[in-house]
Amino acid sequence: MKKFAFLLLAISFVACQKQPKVEFTDEVRLPMTPIKNQGQSQFCWAYAMLSTIETEHILRGDSVHLSTAYIERVVKRRNLRGMGSTLLNIIGRYGIVSHDAYPDTSYHQLPQPKWVFMLGARYTPLEFAHSVCAPGEYMALTSNDNYPYGEEVVLDLPDNWEKNKFLNIPKDSLLAHVERAIRHRHAVCWEGDTDEYGFSFQDGIADGHFNTTPTDNHCMAIVGIARDPKQRLFFTMKNSWGTANPYAGLMYMSAEYLRDKTVAVFMTREAYECAK
């Protein structure tokens, strides 16, 4: 009970410390599907990677809105933890369907769809998955000084239970690749550490410089670049915690925070090549 009372006091203190809204100026803002709320689920990795794929297709002129409930249905008897690469592997094995065919409310109510209908064509979930995300289309990047740079490495993380490989590059190179990818109008899936004091969904901002090793605890899609009133560089993050913050669910992450607290990013190979 004392612990609960202390928690209430801490929450009240944080609420009183809410910062005034910072006015950001967009330099790049990519189109996106509506922001969702993952609730108590552990599926941030699915929300973020699907959002990245959706934005890529919107930029190509396709209207694609993918079902997170379908992914939850597929993995319900497996490990619920994962990374962006986990999502890519799952849809490569089991397919994906549209949000309209299997909305978020369907998980416990409707059977798993056998077909996807899109633009007058009929697909199996696996055929549809290959049409929205070709095998090998995305690549995974990390920056970890425990491994050699320039090599593909297996990150020793609980969420990487599939033992997926990541191209290991220096922090500054990773940051540059992310910025150039966004400026060339490609979405990026970000995975990293949101447990630092500089991260506040309530304020909609993640900022700070850190020397500590990042932990892997959240994923978001990067959908833009902006500047704060001091002309500092920020990345516009599409979160999956609903819309109850000053930016309707978006967050602004400083370049310094992203540089120091990134575990991995996922982008198309085209985005990586144009970002060289």
For the regions a protein language model found, what residue spans apply to each?
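N-terminal regions that are enriched for targeting/export leaders
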Residues: 19-30
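Positively charged n-region of N-terminal signal peptides that target proteins for export
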Residues: 1-4
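C-terminal motif of bacterial Sec signal peptides marking the signal peptidase cleavage site
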Residues: 14-15
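Active-site signature of cysteine proteases
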Residues: 19, 33, 112-276
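Papain-like cysteine protease catalytic cores
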Residues: 64-127
